[in-house]
């Protein structure tokens, strides 16, 4: 039973350095943006901010897509909105599964009633475009859906070649870029991506609670064939789609496109503070410049790997296709992984991640993302981890990790 007195205490969460696979510490500017005054959803200032967010995220996604907007909710809300709006019961979807979050795409597609074909890849590897093309020819899907950066394995699925395959065969291409966006290259138009969803809480350096989404014209047309305007706001000039209604009201992207469109057709009340956060995340990314931000994430990730290897630890997976921003490292046999994580948190205030499924208890996942993709965060984490490992009797090479990581910053 919760202590009743604590219910009335002012929130005072401890200071943490969040070096796991997400969420991470938000940029200070994002905290400041969230604290700004609330205004009404149809206030001209608010609709102006919404227009700005659309323009800013076209820059983040490297796209000219008109339909670029936010879905209110965590990153999973954007994933679900895309899949339930594109797929109807009986539609065929091809899903390369490179980790835990590929299985999530399967789960959502199954709930829609889609016919699913998976390409199951060993965890720690990625799916070759040739495999995708082979299955497209055999299976003839409406949609290929994949995860770009799967934090469960730390792998970064190459998308350019798969996009070319999908474009060549006339298949829609969806990508969950939650963990990869802003820390790894993501070129929506150039790579022929038709639908992409993301989140703020990783390399974009914000809190969880808003999902940026972008849709190609072709994808938006497919979704709008299922358009339904609610009774009570429907007017004579509103046209209904001629296809099956989208099964979810809240995640109906046809409705959400109308809400973000010129008519501002009522659907939900925009999460004002999260819109402020999303706007600031995009401004920070574009001000620093995509090339610079991604390079910062790459050097931070490479420095973390260098430090871990200098300790004598082994990193997980194919390093040629690892995300810039998350590293998997095998837990030394002689230590209890959860005990090390717990002491790292309690003594140093540093959080690193465990893992899922077949990797649970075998690797830690260490993130260098957003505001935490900085030299001091990398060095502090390595020094603290080394100290705790030595205390727990791990056979590591002491005094090497920080110097190895620093060498990448010289």
Across the structure, where does each feature detected by a protein language model lie?
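Conserved N-terminal alpha-helix of the aminotransferase class I/II PLP-enzyme fold
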Residues: 33-81, 100, 104-108
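Conserved PLP-binding catalytic core of the aspartate aminotransferase-like
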Residues: 314-347
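PLP-dependent enzyme catalytic core of the Aspartate aminotransferase-like
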Residues: 358, 362-410
């Amino acid at each position: 039973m919760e202590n009743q007195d604590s219910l009335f205490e002012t929130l005072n969460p401890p200071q943490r350095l969040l070096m796991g696979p997400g969420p991470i510490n938000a940029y200070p500017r994002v905290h400041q943006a969230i604290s700004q005054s609330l205004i009404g959803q149809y206030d001209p200032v608010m609709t102006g901010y919404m227009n700005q967010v659309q323009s800013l995220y076209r820059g983040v996604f490297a796209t000219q897509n008109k339909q670029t907007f936010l879905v209110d909710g965590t990153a999973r809300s954007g994933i679900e909105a895309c899949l339930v709006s594109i797929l109807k019961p009986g539609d065929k979807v091809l899903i390369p599964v490179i980790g835990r979050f590929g299985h999530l795409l399967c789960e959502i597609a199954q709930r829609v009633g889609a016919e699913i074909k998976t390409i199951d890849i060993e965890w720690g590897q990625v799916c070759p475009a040739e495999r995708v093309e082979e299955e497209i020819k055999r299976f003839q899907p409406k949609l290929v859906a994949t995860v770009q950066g799967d934090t469960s394995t730390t792998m970064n699925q190459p998308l350019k070649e798969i996009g070319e395959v999908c474009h060549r065969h006339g298949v829609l291409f969806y990508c969950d870029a939650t963990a990869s966006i802003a820390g790894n290259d993501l070129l929506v138009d150039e790579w022929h991506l038709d639908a992409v969803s993301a989140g703020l809480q990783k390399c974009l350096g914000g809190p969880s609670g808003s999902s940026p989404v972008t849709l190609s014209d072709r994808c938006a047309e497919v979704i709008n064939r299922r358009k339904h305007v609610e009774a009570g706001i429907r007017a004579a000039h509103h046209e209904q789609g001629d296809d099956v209604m989208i099964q979810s009201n809240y995640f109906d992207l046809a409705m959400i496109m109308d809400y973000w469109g010129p008519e501002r057709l009522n659907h939900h009340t925009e999460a004002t503070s999260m819109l402020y956060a999303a706007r600031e995340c995009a401004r920070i990314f574009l001000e620093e410049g995509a090339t610079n931000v991604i390079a910062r994430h790459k050097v931070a990730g490479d420095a973390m790997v260098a430090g871990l290897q200098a300790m004598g630890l082994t990193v997980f997976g194919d390093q040629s296709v690892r995300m810039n921003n998350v590293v998997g490292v095998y837990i030394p046999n002689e230590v209890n992984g959860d005990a090390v994580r717990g002491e790292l948190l309690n003594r140093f205030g540093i959080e690193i991640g465990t893992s899922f499924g077949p990797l649970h208890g075998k690797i830690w996942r260490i993130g260098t993302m957003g505001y935490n993709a900085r030299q001091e965060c990398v060095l502090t984490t390595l020094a603290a981890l080394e100290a705790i490992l030595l205390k727990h009797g791990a056979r590591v090479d002491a005094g090497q990790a920080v110097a190895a990581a620093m060498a990448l910053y010289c």
